[in-house]
């Protein structure tokens, strides 16, 4: 049995959280899941078996997954009962007391953050079997930590909007729009998002390729190249291989392309649920 459910946050938290993803499975045989850079940070609570990071050992029981710049594989070898909070690009930043750059390419055990309230949330979720009650615990925790967004947060949010809406934009233009020198802009962006603006731009460009392939698998490579802001097809293929491990053609032969960044839903037999009040 496999059950995947998407739950949406309250309106007060919707600018921070894309969705909650609840995944349950009682399969015993190993299942491999490919991971790719998504452009988002995740806060994950395992109530069943931990997933195994191929060649690196088990994931922590409860952790933050920072921005990743490379593909990887997870292996499930037991019952999964997981609640994941999928944040918008800047969504986690206001709620924890560390730069997002410290999370880069890492799974950070919640216990290592020495955050008493977050550890209390972890324990509450571990002992509560009702998913909706767990989501209420999460929302209460986050609502208590809501703070006024600072000016640099707004600057970076505007830069992310430009990256999303203008695939041909030059990264140096982002600094100019923020009225900052590039080095200062890069430092602020990296601390808020978790990777440099150039690298983040490349991840979002890769997610855009997936989204266009998802909606039109027959799209011409030239159209895909231009629409996503690549110099030429070989540039597209090079980046795609770096982030997925294979060329677009190879990927299409073994995967159904899907962008977790640009698409509203998550795959795996999604059951849509109403937002929490």
Kindly label every feature range from the protein language model:
Residues 1-157, 161-172, 177-182, 196, ...:
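Alpha-helical bundle regulatory/interaction domains
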Residues 158-159, 205-208:
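Pre-recognition alpha-helix immediately N-terminal to the DNA-recognition helix
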Residues 168, 186-191, 195-201:
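Long, low-complexity intrinsically disordered regions
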Residues 180, 201-204:
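Short beta->alpha linker loops
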Residues 188, 203, 238, 254:
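Residue-level "edge-of-site" marker
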Residues 189-195, 239-250:
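A secondary-structure capping/hinge motif
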Residues 208-215, 226-227, 242:
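Short basic/hydrophobic patches in alpha-helices and adjacent helix-turn junctions
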């Amino acid at each position: 049995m496999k059950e995947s459910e998407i739950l949406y946050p309250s309106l007060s938290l919707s600018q921070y959280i894309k969705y909650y993803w609840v995944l349950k499975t009682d399969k015993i045989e190993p299942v491999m899941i490919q991971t790719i850079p998504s452009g988002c940070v995740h806060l994950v609570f395992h109530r069943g078996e931990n997933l195994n990071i191929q060649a690196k050992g088990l994931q922590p029981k409860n952790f933050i997954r920072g921005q990743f710049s490379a593909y990887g594989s997870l292996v499930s070898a037991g019952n999964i009962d997981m609640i994941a909070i999928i944040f918008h690009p800047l969504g986690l930043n206001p709620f924890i007391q560390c730069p997002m750059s410290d999370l880069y390419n890492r799974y950070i055990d919640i216990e290592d953050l020495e955050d008493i309230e977050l550890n209390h949330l972890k324990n509450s979720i571990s002992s509560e079997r009702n998913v909706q009650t767990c989501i209420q615990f999460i929302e209460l925790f986050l609502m208590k930590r809501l703070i006024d967004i600072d000016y640099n947060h707004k600057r970076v949010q505007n830069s992310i909007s430009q990256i999303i809406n203008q695939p041909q934009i030059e990264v140096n233009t982002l600094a100019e729009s923020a009225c900052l020198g590039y080095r200062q802009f890069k430092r602020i962006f990296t601390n808020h998002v978790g990777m440099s603006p150039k690298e983040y731009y490349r991840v979002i460009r890769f997610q855009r390729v997936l989204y266009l392939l998802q909606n039109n698998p027959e799209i011409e490579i030239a159209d895909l190249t231009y629409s996503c802001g690549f110099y030429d097809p070989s540039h597209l293929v090079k980046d795609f291989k770096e982030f997925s491990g294979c060329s677009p053609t190879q990927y299409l032969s073994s995967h159904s392309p899907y962008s977790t960044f640009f698409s509203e839903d998550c795959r795996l037999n999604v059951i849509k649920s109403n937002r929490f009040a």
